[in-house]
Amino acid sequence: MIPVQVGKKIRYSYAKFPEILELPYLIEIQKKSYQWFLDEGLREVFREISPITDFTGNLSLEFLDYYLGKPKYSVEECKERDFTYSAPLRVKVRLLNKETGEIKEQEVFLGDFPLMTEKGTFIFNGAERVVISQMVRSPGVYFSEQVDPNGKKMYLATIIPNRGAWLEFETDVNDHIYVRIDRTRKLPVTVLLKALGYESKGRIAELFDHDDKIIATLERDNTDSREEALIEIYKKLRPGEPPTVESAKTLLDSMFFDPKRYDLGNVGRYKLFKKLNHGVLYRYLEEDGEKEYDKYLNDYVPVKREFIRELTNEDIIYTIRYLLGLMRGQGKVDDIDHLGNRRLRSVGELLQNQFRIGLARMERVVRERMTIQDADSLTPQVLINTRPIVAAIKEFFGSSQLSQFMDQTNPLAELTHKRRLSALGPGGLSRERAGFEVRDVHHSHYGRMCPIETPEGPNIGLIGNLTTYARVNEFGFIETPYRKVDKERGVVTNEIVYLTADEEEKYIIAQANVRLSPEGKFLDEMVNARHGSEILHVEPSKVDFVDVSPKQVFSVATSLIPFLEHDDANRALMGANMQRQAVPLIRTEAPVVGTGIEYKAAKDSGVVVLAKNPGVVERVTADEIVIRNDQGQIDRYKLIKFQRSNQGTCINQKPIVRKGERVEKDQIIADGPSTDHGELALGKNVLVAYMPWEGYNYEDAILISEKLVKEDVFTSIHIEEYECDARDTKLGPEEITRDIPNVGEDALKDLDERGIIRIGAEVRPGDILVGKVTPKGETELTAEERLLRAIFGEKAREVRDTSLRVPHGESGKVVDVKVFSRENGDELSPGVNMLVRVYIAQKRKISVGDKMAGRHGNKGVVARILPEEDMPFLPDGTPVEIVLNPLGVPSRMNIGQILECHLGWAAKALGINVATPIFNGATEEDIFEALRKAGLPEDGKIEVRDGRTGEPFDSRVTVGYVYMLKLAHLVDDKIHARSTGPYSLVTQQPLGGKAQFGGQRFGEMEVWALEAYGAAYTLQEILTIKSDDVVGRVKTYEAIVKGENIPEPGVPESFKVLIKELQSLGLDVKVLTDNDEEVEIKEIDDDIGEKAEEYGLAASIADRDEVKNEYYEEEVEADFEINDDFDGDLED
């Protein structure tokens, strides 16, 4: 064991191989990409669009330079006031009138542009959001093959641009080559070649070394000149329009050779260059300027150059040559799931595309205005309308599938969310269309995309995570680092080379755990290595590179699972996903058995406070740290106290430095949620015994000790936000007031003089948080009322109580109240005069029904809480804290939990924390050694006695310390009961789901169950008066209130609806008695309506906006597991 300094603590590491490379900054993918957008991306778009000329070519508008101003509000203010954290984008624009030669320059404001915060997130309308990276097929040329029923191979080549028309070349059974332009009907390929200017047949045959397949194709081609070829193409592309040579040429040029209409992007050009090997890459802007070395061309080329982003004739010719080569058996077809053919569009590029759409819309407006308005009075300011740009950006952040509400359950959830890769979204795949191949683990994922961490369910394999060391290159391909082998000396050097999936295919790469001498020479005769998709056993002399670290294959969440190497992949997947759902506990505790990456994960997640400069701490309080830096200046760090996260968990920072202490730059000076002295701390180390106990841990249930409840071991704070606004209505403004009709003084005791609850009040369901009255419609007044109105003035005006009350099943302490009003100059949405937000915090102790899990996918639900004295206890009298079922281990094959249990016990006994990095950690021998050192039994088992009787159990039991998490699926959020409540409009049945305060569905199968027992009356009652017999349920309620017998059920409303539906089909449906007399099914009686009002049941028909869905849909509730498959689109 090697002691490693982690922040202020020491961890003893079992690592066998040293870490060659530090972990990179984990949210670099977000920040670097956004920075690229600000520096380069915006400039690129302005360059593309500029200049905008009018239809006569007289006026032209150029975009020269741009800059972002200072943001108007800070991040905190934006969160508080529901604003977007953004800065004004100003652009220098020049308008040139070519007739008069007049030039007007102006600085124009192009709207507010959302800024990325320090943590790599955006604040949009007060909510913290993340833009995730999208995996899409890279532009370029792709070759594929199909085999027809006779066994003949047919080939297809497709040139896919970034935007523009597709060009496809295909062969048929007779080996003729055809071309399809933009998915239209096919033409012989020679027609396209003639149209491009290769007119003579001899010239075409020469281009392809007189290949017989081309000559055969020429025979199929009945055009004789360039003109005929152009017209033939035009007929295929625009059937029904009169073809002319001129329009045909223009069409073909604009389709493939016009940068405005066709764009391969830098990536597409690079991919064509790599695949076709034809040397077409750059356009040189100055042939004789200074030169520099270019790594792609391996040559010195002029510095002033740009990628050729449209198609060239060479591209088409070389593509056909490659196709001919494939038919001869040379070259190879592409695998579209290979990461060399899939690239990432990160924030910057996604924003750039959106901005481009906005600018293109604006360009149309500018052109129109140029034409309509008088040329002399025009200025850039008048021409430019910023609305389309602002709208495009708003649309992207507000409703794109890739802009997601940040998962903020805990720091790991935040970090992982920012590193997420999705194949879904605009221009990507759809869940229904994606087959198995796309979702599968591919050999090119190695070191780039984690094979473990992906959601279970419909998105499996479509949403992934970046691995720990991976980075994204300028073309959007994921690169992973390797150590270079110096072949001449046979030494593994510490030189790091980053390779993309394509480049890696050429090399033989050894694993990170090869045995090396101190000089870096291989110690083994043969080593394990990879080459492409194969695993080889090769002699060291053949190895080109060596992996940097075993961690490089896995994502951050996966790397946090100790002994991952002993867990089955399915369970590891659950473990990685469930760590993201752990709720932050009141008192955090770092794991005794960690993997050594906890510190880095917490530091980069953005929840802890880092010192900006080195210095000495001058003052520390709960909400602020003051440091005098080495320049003698004061740095103040405000800490976040009890703030609500997006998921309702609690964000709270606390200082971990003392007054007078010396701090260095980037040192962690304050802990955030779920961190302990700068280390990620998602759960607690608890003493666990693996044994059955009276059947209470059957089927993964968990038995816990009351100590965990009493000592607040698994207690978390949850904060809910309630909002109430006073609007202007047609009948007058709503008013927030303490004076509420028909409410006793008792209900108002915690409200202040404005009618808003005081901070610190304990509230229960139904309590008033904000008193509010709304004007009612004026009714005809009686003489007495008129008299009262005359005497008391306005006071007797009709108002109804629309106060904000605590919803069912919620309670807690009011921790914060925010009031915004128009009078105080706050910006509120139109029609709103006052807005009040109330925050209620709950302390939730662990309780029966809560979901808990370890880090190995071992999840379960708390089934019973036993008094401490009844728990099984160890020989020294220590009662265990949790009892897990041993049958949960063998079939699930997550043995890592047992090793963690043993090592945890030993480490706890020795009073140390250990790190066992994945695939590079403690071995069985190490664990035995640790147990021996701690004086514990070597097999990790010990005699345990029953707490109730003191008798020992039959066998010895595995006992040890395991890191357990409490997950966000808490029973308090799920439990729900209703007696009366809202009913659906059409069927008159209760709504479903907790969110609608609905009832429990008594479905088809449940009816069968009662039928099976012959419980006729129970069944009738459930299907009528407990559901949709409108008259019956009111009478029943009356009978219950008065203590009378329950009346006979009537006719269910849904039966009436059925009859009406049949009648609407034109069928004459009547209900008859035994004596063939027609039964009049009366509509709902008026007196019943009055009765209902009497019992306060009248308002129980659900309003349109209350009902999420008229008919009960499987749990309309909003508690689908956001974390399990969080992909931003909430179709689920």
Swiss-Prot record:
Its EC number is 2.7.7.6. SUPFAM superfamilies: beta and beta-prime subunits of DNA dependent RNA-polymerase. It catalyses: RNA(n) + a ribonucleoside 5'-triphosphate = RNA(n+1) + diphosphate. GO terms for biological process: DNA-templated transcription. Belongs to the RNA polymerase beta chain family. DNA-dependent RNA polymerase catalyzes the transcription of DNA into RNA using the four ribonucleoside triphosphates as substrates. NCBIfam families: PRK00405.1 (NF001616), rpoB (TIGR02013). PANTHER family: DNA-DIRECTED RNA POLYMERASE I SUBUNIT 2. This is DNA-directed RNA polymerase subunit beta. The gene is rpoB.
